[in-house]
Amino acid sequence: MSLQKKPDLKDPVLRAKLAKGMGHNYYGEPAWPNDLLYTFPVCILGTIGCLVGLAVLEPTMFGEPANPFATPLEILPEWYFFPVFQILRVIPNKLLGVVLMAGVPAGLLTVPFIESINKFQNPFRRPVAMTVFLIGTVVAVWLGIGATLPIDTSLTLGFF
């Protein structure tokens, strides 16, 4: 059962805002039927039209046919798998690599519980979440760049 807080209509600040027009129908036109029947279909059909037009005008170019007998020396995954690929490539024990990969979402799931005492929405007033985000971004970029390099320079990125 949810508890809904009702506005205090005796509050002078709220009464002043309501007198100026804030509240119901604040923007001057109702959402139904104007937005739901006219604006949204135009946006959705326009997006679909742009995608179909781009697909027709610029079809995907296929490269050379695959030759299973001549594989490249090092096969790289798609760019969004580079950090995971680097973890599996660098850690000698594959089970430890899989545990580290599972630890990333597990660690992200713990952040709201660690910072549950902080009720601010501003990210600069939530130091734990901001630190986890910044460190995670730096580590993911570092691992992603390292995955594109040879294995001997991948950890140091050639700096050391």
Swiss-Prot record:
Database matches in PROSITE patterns: CYTB_CTER (PS51003)
Localization: Plastid, Chloroplast thylakoid membrane
GO MF entries: electron transporter, transferring electrons within cytochrome b6/f complex of photosystem II activity; electron transporter, transferring electrons within the cyclic electron transport pathway of photosynthesis activity; oxidoreductase activity
Any one Gene Ontology BP term: photosynthetic electron transport chain
SUPFAM superfamilies the UniProt entry points to: a domain/subunit of cytochrome bc1 complex (Ubiquinol-cytochrome c reductase) (SSF81648)
GO CC annotations on file: chloroplast thylakoid membrane
Keywords per UniProt: Chloroplast, Electron transport, Membrane, Photosynthesis, Plastid, Thylakoid, Transmembrane, Transmembrane helix, Transport
Chain segments annotated as transmembrane: 36-56, 95-115, 131-151
Recorded superkingdom: Eukaryota
CDD domains tied to this protein: cytochrome_b_C
Disulfide bond residue pairs: none
Membrane topology: Multi-pass membrane protein
Keyword Heme (UniProt): no
Function: Component of the cytochrome b6-f complex, which mediates electron transfer between photosystem II (PSII) and photosystem I (PSI), cyclic electron flow around PSI, and state transitions.
Record text on subunit structure and interactions: The 4 large subunits of the cytochrome b6-f complex are cytochrome b6, subunit IV (17 kDa polypeptide, petD), cytochrome f and the Rieske protein, while the 4 small subunits are petG, petL, petM and petN. The complex functions as a dimer.
Protein family: Belongs to the cytochrome b family. PetD subfamily.
Protein name (record): Cytochrome b6-f complex subunit 4
Gene source species: Mesostigma viride (Green alga)
Gene name for this UniProt entry: petD
